[in-house]
Amino acid sequence: MSARHSTTALPRRFSRTLLACALLPLGLLAANMATAAPLQAQPAATAADNFGPLKHVNAGVLDVAYVEQGPADGPVVILLHGWPYDIHSFEQVAPALAAKGYRVLVPYVRGYGQTRFLSAATPRNAQPSALASDVIAFMDALHIQRAVLAGFDWGARTADIVSALWPERVKALVSVSGYLISSQEAAKAPLPPSAELQWWYQYYFATARGQAGYEKNRHAFAKLIWQTASPKWAFDDATFERSAKALDNPDQVVITVHNYRWRLGLAQGETRYDPLEAKLASFPSIGVPTITLEGDANGAPHPPAEAYAQRFTGKYEYRLISGGIGHNLPQEAPQAFTQAVVDADHL
């Protein structure tokens, strides 16, 4: 079930504390937004891979591996995964959208799966504007002018950024956990101890020990994140291992570590992205039609909906998805996610 609210139903006046939650990556606090008694989490999907063969396209600095479903002339939807997940988060969403006539594209992010850098000389950079630029390059390579963007975790942040910086390329947006645009300057602000604790892995990755630990224990590390971010999701080992294979990418560790170090100002990006990061540091509004989603059992740090509602200035809805739904919302609640994509497209 989902609780649906229009933008007018959300408060337009909020405190500095709530605003600060929206400005840091994935927010600062885990908010309890459930409106009913928790229900049992949905069982994990079968481990059978229904995606079919991967396609590849050279896009910008990458050889992007992606899945495509649906009619070639259908309206385009691009689904963006997060960390430490992969394209199988959308295994049920993609065919459902394809059945409705959409051309669905699900790319592996740089550093995941079969996506590869075209040159060994390219910096293994994972700053937010670089990931967003990858989406634009992917669209350009496939001659796609506009698309509906939908994502969670890193994918939601990337979709937010593309929508803010290139709104002419985005028909509509679906973002789990809302407005996730941030800056290195905003990340300098210390958080309450309980909030800092939720970001333990970010600080772990800031150390040489953390990088070595992730390199040595990629799958075990990812499983721990899955369990804490979705505490009521009963995924099985086969489901997890299918996605965990994407973390065997040779650039996975350096990409993940760079992403989190960059957020804290501990790693540099590329100067060519400086103009984009400067725009993002002003926390631009998003004017494209948008639906934001939240699971009622999201164990990852995330901002309350009231903290970011004002950032969406176009047609907007917020939906709380109940039933013990955690951070990997498209895989845990595929019907709700699919419906949000269709509805956002028609806002």
Regions found by a protein language model. Name each.
Residues 68-117, 308:
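Conserved HGGG/HGGXW glycine-rich cap/lid loop of the alpha/beta-hydrolase fold
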Residues 82, 153, 331-332:
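Conserved acidic functional residues
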Residues 37-51, 61-64, 69, 76, ...:
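Flexible "cap/lid" subdomain of the alpha/beta-hydrolase fold that forms the substrate-access gate
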Residues 18-32:
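Bacterial N-terminal signal peptides
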Residues 55-59:
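Short acidic-hydrophobic surface loop/beta-edge motif
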Residues 1-14:
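N-terminal secretory signal peptides that target proteins for export/translocation
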Residues 132, 257, 334-338, 342:
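Short, amphipathic alpha-helical "lid/cap" segments that border enzyme active or binding sites
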Residues 325-333:
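Catalytic histidine-centered segment of alpha/beta-hydrolase-like enzymes
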